Amino acid sequence: MTTPHLDRLRAHCQRLRLHRLEAELPNLLEQAAKREMSYSDWLDELLSLEIQSKAEKHLAMRTAMARFPFQKTLDAFDFKFQPSIDPKVIRELATGRYLESGDNVLLLGPPGVGKTHLAVALGLKACEQGIRVLFTTAAGLIATLGKAFAENRLDERLKILAQPQLLIIDEIGYIPIDRQGANLFFQLISRRYERGSILVTSNQSLGAWGEVFGDAVLATAILDRLLHHSITVNIRGDSYRLREKLKAGLLKSKHVPEPATE
């Protein structure tokens, strides 16, 4: 193919924003000639390549906007180390069907058992399914809401936090929440009630949330909305972080839980 012709095709790709095709056009033309592809087969391959490229870009954008603290997958989770977790329940959550019905998810258990890992992994799965996700810690969320309240922008911030189809709130119960923080948290839960899913992790049992929020009445109102349509996963097991410290010799113990092997 002549250079002017190739340049014209590239210009067309630029105008149509077919950036992947523009970059790979010479190779695609060469492969089409070598394989003696029909026009329809070649066009199908071109469009499939561009669709894949755009899907990858959109996934990368959704993942970046979710603000995950790290990226971990379900495949990397050691279910055999945490036998209290039913893998079928987590795999079902990974399908995203709970998002279609607007259900909430509560991951409860002591520190280090993998709650945040599961929350991030489920969030990544949701991103792969085209879902808009936002990850935040409870402390970060309360601080954000408190700042918005002080600046008279609370309603604006609540509208923003109500937009993601999945809001992940990590580490409820790790630090105490004052009365104002509890009230702001309740307003967010109420704003999202039956509008979008919330996934929370907590190291406290639900019965202790009155102490976490410093107000039993507010805690009950929050739980009433979270539990109305929800799936609760209770994790009872050893800490992954403690296991790694034991393996590294930083701690000593008579019983060191070993990771399961195939």
Predicted feature residues:
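Conserved, well-folded catalytic cores of nucleic-acid-processing
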Residues: 12-19, 28-31, 46-49, 53, ...
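Solvent-exposed alpha-helical segments within well-ordered globular domains of core cellular machineries
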Residues: 7, 11-14, 23-26, 41-44, ...
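AAA+ P-loop ATPase motor domain of ring mechanoenzymes
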Residues: 44-97, 101, 240-252
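Conserved P-loop
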Residues: 85-163, 212
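Interdomain "pre-motor" coupling segment immediately N-terminal to P-loop NTPase/helicase cores
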Residues: 10, 14, 18-70
